[in-house]
Amino acid sequence: MSEAVPLSTRRASSAGDAPGRAPVLDIDSLDMEARGVGRVVDENGEPGKVIFVEGALPGERVTYSSFRRKPTYEQAQVVDILRPSVMRTQPKCAFFGTCGGCSMQHLDMRAQVAIKQRVLEDNLWHLAKLRAEAMFAPIHGPSWGYRYRARLTVRHVAKKGGVLVGFHEKKSSYVADMTSCEVLPPHVSAMLVPLRRLVEQLSIRDRMPQIELAVGARVTALVLRVLEPINAADEALLREFADTHRVQFWLQPKGPDTVAPFYPLDAQLDYTLPEFGIRMPFKPTDFTQVNHQINRVLVGRALRLLAPERGDRVLDLFCGIGNFTLPLARLAREVVGIEGSDALTARALENAKENGVDGHTSFACRNLFEVTADDLRALGAFDKFLVDPPREGALAVSKALAEIAQSGAGPLPARIVYVSCNPSTLARDAGLLVHEAGYRLKGAGVVNMFPHTSHVESIALFERD
């Protein structure tokens, strides 16, 4: 059972915005940034400004302090909770509220997932006038220690006593003074203070703005963004730290293409998809899902929805390093993966060979944000599509499918599984697929890839007769 915040001894007052008092507000809902939303009512009972209150939950009565005022709304921070919600729980992290890494630790996990499901449904309806024929059961898993990828900012702050390593403070460019993190794997959380001490000793302490974290099944990699070369003393310190904490250091002197392993050289990052007998090597700068446990469940769900058969030809768009392509190749006759990055395309090809499915796969590098109907026709007929775009969505792909459907010139897949990390672009693309390409939205559901944040990942199934 969730631990509720003790009831405040202060009482709500109808004169809540009298001089010297913090105004009182009843919270009706949460927005997409996990802020409580309420509306001021004037003395005549007429609705007034909308107030977005950080730290407030639906059903609560709170006092608040506004830090930004606009003609139709205000942004505020909660001051006191006069009537707490049954959904409120005690945050696990000592730095919650200051650190910007999480925004929902004060909200019960079941309520977090329910709110994300509502955000998905609201986006589909308000942006595309769509309701899914079925809402899938949410995909969820461990809510702590799940974040296998992270970008940590490094900054020397004399007033704070030295080097800080961590996420930014909430809505700030400052680095949170954090000594642990509940959503990072425990061994990484325990490394934050030693990392601060390490950077403090380096000659390039003030020329190393960030550390990129990537955790694999057996290896933890730390990519140091170095604006100046390291010296021999730095090298010795890095080697000692790597041996002590069992990590691998990579150095990035310029752009992403300059990333190279420093020490040890023989370690290899990978993750596995045991259900399909897949081992997926990757580099720390490759795109991989943040939450490995949820990714396994997501891949299984996506393939069951797509239901590839032995004779099927499947197109995997935005395929990355082959996260869906390789499992699909275990089940279908042929899978074609298209990706916009040359490096990821090459890695997908290597991974297909590593897993013995190169005979059932082929890969190509294309700009999928500019793909046309003619481009899709040139690829030939496919029985099914899997689409897993970045936050920008798959607008060009959706438009191309709509054009093919309306012209009647070219084959269309009977089934599309769309994995999304942005409910608004999913809704936009779903509108095109349903209203212009003739598909039905058979089902949709949320994937709680990022517990304790407002980030909404989702999956949707489209079918066409």
Swiss-Prot record:
Residues 1-24 are annotated as: Disordered. It is an enzyme of class 2 (transferase). [4Fe-4S] cluster binds at C93, C99, C102, C181. S-adenosyl-L-methionine binds at Q289, F318, N323, E339, N367, D388. Belongs to the class I-like SAM-binding methyltransferase superfamily. RNA M5U methyltransferase family. RlmD subfamily. The gene is rlmD. The active site is at C421. InterPro entries: 23S_rRNA_MeTrfase_RlmD, MeTrfase_TrmA_CS, NA-bd_OB-fold, SAM-dependent_MTases_sf, TRAM_dom, U5_MeTrfase_fam. Residues 16-80 form the TRAM domain. Catalyzes the formation of 5-methyl-uridine at position 1939 (m5U1939) in 23S rRNA. The keyword Membrane does not apply. Keywords: 4Fe-4S, Iron, Iron-sulfur, Metal-binding, Methyltransferase, rRNA processing, S-adenosyl-L-methionine, Transferase. It holds the Pfam family tRNA_U5-meth_tr. This is 23S rRNA (uracil(1939)-C(5))-methyltransferase RlmD. It catalyses: uridine(1939) in 23S rRNA + S-adenosyl-L-methionine = 5-methyluridine(1939) in 23S rRNA + S-adenosyl-L-homocysteine + H(+). PROSITE patterns: SAM_MT_RNA_M5U, TRAM, TRMA_2. GO terms for biological process: rRNA base methylation. Its EC number is 2.1.1.190.
